[in-house]
């Protein structure tokens, strides 16, 4: 994590995994520091709230075992529900240690800082294809991370596209692939 700290003064590592420092106590610790970074970044415009409803089309390009891959997806808001009482399903058990860490961070920042990775059935790929059509010709925000993964992000604000994608995805189950602890903490924190 030290390399990520050095990479950029606004690296999200300062929020997600702020390091412990000598002399940390109840009033000044990794969670309160993360909250201060978040507050300052919002004030400075490093992080900004999008005022309009949107879907965020997200691509990752990476190599594995000598092959090139493109992972396509999108970010959206979902309704928080208890597992088994709605359409959101876990695939693994969670543990108290990681949940406590995420709870302390969420309480300090009053924000969910990272997305939950979910999968839903769409054998015809209808939702993603609508989004790919919506971003055709857009210049994405692009960044390459410390592992060499290239990230592309495009914002879709077209109400018709958002409505159509929502109609496809809303009735389907969502299986959490990564982020069980974050989901449970977000649900408990609402």
What are the functions of these language-model segments?
Residues 1-187:
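A cross-family signal for N-terminal binding/gating loops and helix N-caps
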């Amino acid at each position: 994590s030290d390399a990520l700290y050095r990479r950029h003064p606004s690296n999200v590592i300062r929020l997600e995994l702020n390091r412990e420092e000598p002399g940390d106590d109840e009033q000044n610790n990794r969670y309160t520091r993360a909250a201060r970074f978040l507050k300052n970044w919002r004030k400075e415009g490093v992080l900004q709230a999008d005022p309009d409803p949107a879907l965020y089309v997200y691509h990752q390009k990476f190599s594995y075992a000598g092959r090139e891959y493109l992972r396509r997806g999108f970010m959206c808001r979902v309704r928080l529900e208890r597992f088994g009482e709605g359409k959101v399903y876990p695939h693994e058990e969670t543990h108290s240690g990681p949940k406590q860490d995420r709870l302390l961070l969420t309480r300090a920042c009053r924000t969910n800082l990272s997305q939950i990775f979910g999968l839903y059935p769409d054998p015809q790929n209808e939702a993603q294809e609508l989004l790919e059509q919506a971003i055709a010709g857009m210049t994405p925000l692009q960044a390459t991370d410390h592992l060499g993964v290239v990230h592309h992000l495009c914002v879709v604000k077209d109400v018709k596209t958002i409505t159509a994608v929502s109609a496809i995805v809303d009735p389907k189950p969502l299986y959490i692939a990564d982020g069980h602890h974050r989901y449970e903490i977000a649900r408990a924190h609402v």
